[in-house]
């Protein structure tokens, strides 16, 4: 009887080892192989693009089988051409670049919306405090914004339109350095300024301006614009994305996970993971504390917000009005990821 028990034990061990080897082979076969891609980013180390570095540092790209190289570059027609042939897999930049691309015949669209507020504050010159009490009183005011295509100018235009005013009802003042801007606010040469942190805090600390409207938080943005304001997106060439749907899905999945992480952690916890940003514009804790308010919870593009942003841009650039806004974004990849 003893030899039989020994034989049975040896057989059991053999089968166990064989089973483990088989499972290992299956696991290896199922594991995603790293796909080398290039991701273009309009500002790798800026807070509005925080999800890019965070996804990289958290290993979320790797988890989805992606070996990602980040390329620092501005959005352009040349980049769109590289998106079309796959030299670059995707571009992280402001949503309005998809409207520009579509107006020029390039089929680019956002595949995930990461930031849904401008990431600014509208500050009023302290000498006007009390004299102007609501956004409906912006008519005739002088606002320091940005260049014509900038998110700051689009924000100012959208603020006017939402109040039933025209974009010609205010005077846009070109931005300068923050010391000069502070002087303009103090000397009565400007009434308002649209600014991010840490500049907004600088104007407040200098005693020349105070926050009039919060354009960082979702709640504040809805109050000021009537909807959220899509800013940071990942966009792709749609013919390329349709030809490589798994690649698009893996990228979107990594960013959906990153948005969940941002919404579940404190500014201090997040700052500890992105020393590159902290070493730059995030030196002051309030920069990241304010910045993380910009980010969506799920990555879906709200149709009403996309249309309203297009309206604000088209008010200054009428040629963009011909763009079919439904072609500037898709929620299909995010919806697939969220169903998992």
Residue locations for each model-derived region?
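N-terminal secretory signal peptides that target proteins for export/translocation
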Residues: 1-9
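Bacterial N-terminal signal peptides
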Residues: 12-25
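Short, glycine-/small- and polar/acidic-enriched structural segments
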Residues: 31-168, 172-175, 191-197, 208
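Short, solvent-exposed loop/beta-turn-alpha elements that line the ligand-binding surface or hinge
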Residues: 63, 216-227, 293-304
């Amino acid at each position: 009887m003893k030899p039989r028990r020994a034989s049975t034990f040896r057989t059991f061990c053999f089968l166990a080892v064989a089973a483990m080897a088989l499972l290992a082979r299956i696991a290896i076969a199922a594991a995603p192989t790293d796909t080398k891609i290039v991701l273009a980013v309009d500002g790798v180390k800026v807070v509005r693009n925080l999800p890019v570095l965070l996804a990289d540092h958290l290993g979320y790209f790797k988890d989805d089988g992606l070996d990602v190289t980040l390329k620092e570059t501005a959005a352009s027609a040349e980049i769109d051409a590289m998106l079309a042939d796959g030299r670059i897999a995707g571009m992280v930049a402001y949503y309005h670049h998809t409207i520009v691309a579509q107006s020029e015949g390039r089929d680019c669209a956002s595949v995930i919306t990461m930031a849904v507020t401008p990431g600014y504050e509208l500050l009023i010159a302290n000498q006007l405090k009390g004299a102007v009490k609501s956004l409906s009183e912006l008519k005739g005011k002088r606002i320091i914004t940005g260049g014509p295509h900038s998110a700051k100018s689009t924000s100012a235009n959208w603020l006017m339109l939402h109040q039933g005013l025209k974009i010609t009802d205010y005077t846009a003042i070109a931005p300068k350095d923050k010391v000069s801007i502070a002087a303009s606010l103090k000397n009565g040469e400007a009434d308002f300024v649209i600014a991010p942190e840490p500049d907004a805090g600088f104007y407040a600390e200098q005693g020349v301006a105070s926050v009039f409207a919060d354009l960082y938080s979702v709640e504040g943005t809805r109050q000021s614009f009537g909807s959220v304001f899509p800013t940071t997106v990942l966009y792709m060439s749609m013919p390329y994305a349709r030809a490589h749907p798994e690649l698009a899905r893996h990228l979107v999945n990594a960013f959906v996970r990153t948005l969940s992480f941002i919404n579940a952690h404190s500014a201090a916890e997040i700052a500890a993971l992105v020393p590159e940003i902290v070493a730059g514009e995030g030196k002051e804790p309030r920069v990241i504390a304010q910045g993380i308010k910009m980010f969506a919870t799920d990555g879906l593009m709200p149709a009403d917000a996309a249309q309203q942003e297009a309206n604000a841009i088209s008010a200054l650039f009428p040629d963009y009005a011909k763009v079919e806004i439904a072609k500037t974004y898709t929620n299909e990849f995010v919806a697939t990821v969220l169903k998992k």
